[in-house]
């Protein structure tokens, strides 16, 4: 299968609630690489690379609200060029 990369911008109550940590856990379980980081506007950027079905599962998890402590209002997803990440990290 072909590797794909996406950037997802997650809006709502997603900072200070363990969102990046839980996203890292979910992405790692799906075998994805990339990162999650807080943005200045209160959203979280998730860049994920891997097999299309696994990336789709992460996007579905994000759209379904992520961790229970978060409240996701909307998720914008954009395709990205291939990138070579080692694992899935939290960026600061």
Swiss-Prot record:
Pfam families recorded: Acylphosphatase
EC number: 3.6.1.7
Family: Belongs to the acylphosphatase family.
PANTHER family: ACYLPHOSPHATASE
Record: active site: 20, 38
Name by which UniProt lists this protein: Acylphosphatase
Residue intervals passing through the bilayer: none
Secretion signal span: none
SUPFAM superfamilies in the record: Acylphosphatase/BLUF domain-like
Enzymatic reactions: an acyl phosphate + H2O = a carboxylate + phosphate + H(+)
Span of domain Acylphosphatase-like: 5-92
GO molecular function: acylphosphatase activity
Protein keywords: Hydrolase
Higher taxonomy: Bacteria, Pseudomonadati, Pseudomonadota, Gammaproteobacteria, Enterobacterales
Enzyme class: hydrolase
């Amino acid at each position: 299968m072909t590797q794909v990369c996406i950037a997802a911008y997650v809006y709502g109550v997603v900072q200070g609630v363990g969102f990046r940590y839980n996203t890292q856990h979910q992405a790692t379980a799906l075998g994805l690489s990339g990162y999650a980081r807080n943005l200045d506007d209160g959203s979280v950027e998730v860049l994920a690379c891997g097999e299309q079905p696994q990336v789709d599962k992460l996007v579905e998890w994000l759209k379904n609200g992520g961790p229970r402590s978060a409240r996701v209002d909307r998720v914008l997803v954009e395709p990205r060029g291939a990138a070579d990440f080692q694992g899935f990290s939290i960026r600061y």
